[in-house]
Amino acid sequence: MDIWKFYDIRHRGLLLCNPMNEEKLERLCRLFRLERGTRALDIACGKGECLVRLAELYGITGVGVNISPYCIKDCLEKKRARVPEADIRFIEMDGAKYEPEHGESFDLTMCVGASWVFGGHRGSLRALSKITRPEGLIAVGEPFWLLDPSEEYLKTEGIRKEEFGTHSDNVKVGEEEGLVCLYTLVSNHDDWDHYETYQWWAVDDYVRTHPDDPDNLELLEKTRVGKESYLRWGRDTVGWAIYIFRKSQKA
C-alpha cells in the first residue's frame, strides 16, 4: 500500500497531523509575535494549517514543503479558501532536499513531528539552523520517553530506544547546538487520544465507503497493530512536545 495514501486515509478529518490540539496551535502562533512580511519555512508541513494561520495573523510570506501529494493538495485548497492572496508557496518534494535561494534567509523555520526527514532531532535542528537567520526562531515537534520502553513495544513499532530521548534531553540537544530554548508545548493524554483514536474512526469510515479497495486488508491490519501498540504501551510510554528555540548570533 502506498505510504502516503495510508497516511492520508488515517488523517482525513484531522486539522493537525500530530498530537496537538487547535487551542495550543493558536497559542503557539500568537506567541511567535511575528512582523508582517516575516519569512517562514515549514518542512513536512502537513496540511498547511500553521503557515495559513500565520498568514492570517501576521501576513507572513512562506514556503511549505511536503513529500506527500495528498498533503500538498490539501495545502493548496486551504490556501485558496482562506488566504488566496498570501505569498505562500507549497512544494511537493523531500524536505531534506529543499534548498532556499539564499542561506540564512528565514526568520522562522519549522519541522513539527517529522525529524526523520533529517535523521533525528539533532539533525533536524542542525538543518534548520543553517537556513535560519541569526536571532531567528526554530520550531520542532519531537517525541520523548515518559518511561523506558519495553522491548515488545520497540519491536512492534520498529524503532530503537536511542532514537528518542527524554523531554529534558530534547531541550539539551538544542542547547548543545548553540540554540536557546524559549518555550515548550507538551501534549497531554487527551491530545494523544484524539490524534490516535480519530485515525481508527477514519479507517473504519474509509473501509465502509470503499469496500472494493484492494488495500483494505492491509489498512485494517496496520490499524489493528497500531491500536494495540498504543493502548498497551504507547499511551503511557511516549510523550510529545513542540520546542521553540532562538538561533543565537554565534550558532
Please report, for each region that a protein language model flagged, where it lies by residue:
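A short SAM/SAH-binding and catalytic strip from SAM-dependent methyltransferases
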Residues: L108-G120
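Conserved alpha-helix/loop element of class I SAM-dependent methyltransferases that forms part
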Residues: N18-R36
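Class I SAM-dependent methyltransferase SAM/SAH-binding core
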Residues: L41, E49-K97
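A short acidic, Gly/Pro-enriched loop at the edge of an enzyme's catalytic core
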Residues: P100-T109
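Conserved Class I S-adenosyl-L-methionine
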Residues: L185-A251
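Short alpha-helix
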Residues: E163-G178
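Short, glycine-/aromatic-enriched active-site segment of Class I SAM-dependent methyltransferases
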Residues: V140-K161
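A short glycine-rich, Lys/Arg-flanked "PGG" loop and its adjoining helix->strand segment in the class I
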Residues: R122-L137
